[in-house]
Amino acid sequence: LMVGGHYTYAEVPLFDTIKELFNLERNNYDKVGHFVQGFVPAIIAREILIRKNVVNAGINSKAWLNVFVISICLAFSAFYELLEWWVAIASGENAEAFLGTQGYVWDTQSDMGVALLGAICAITFLDKIHDKQLSKLRP
């Protein structure tokens, strides 16, 4: 993600090459960042909710845990998008460069959608591994 901070998310060279190779309209490096923005907080939120026993063991506890984790990730993503918007308003003329929308009117919504995908992937692919690691910590 620091690479995007160095070049700006819309101008990361590797993703410019990918854009040219696949004849894409935009540099999609920011989507990688937003995927991670959903993936990493999902595991953190899941662990906190489990360790703090927020969702009690029961018939639908795993489903509710997943709902809460995804909701937390989407709230985090929405807050980040609002923060981007506020910084863009405050900075004025360089708002387009900061936001990296590249003329895509649905950029904010797609960023949140990719964060949602990241959260779902984390829950789907890491829940069993995460549960096994957490069980080793319990006495």
Segments predicted by a language model, with ranges:
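Interfacial helix-loop-helix junctions of multi-pass membrane proteins
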Residues: V12-K19, Y29, L74-L116
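Membrane-interfacial alpha-helical segments at the cytosolic side of multi-pass membrane proteins
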Residues: V36-N53, I89-G92, M112-I129
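"…centered on the first transmembrane helix and the immediately adjacent amphipathic helix/loop
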Residues: L1-F39, I43
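Internal alpha-helical transmembrane segments of multi-pass membrane proteins
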Residues: V54-L74
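Glycine-centered secondary-structure boundary/capping sites
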Residues: N23, V54-G58, L82, G92
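Alpha-helical transmembrane segments of multi-pass membrane proteins
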Residues: L1-G4, A42-R46, I72-E84
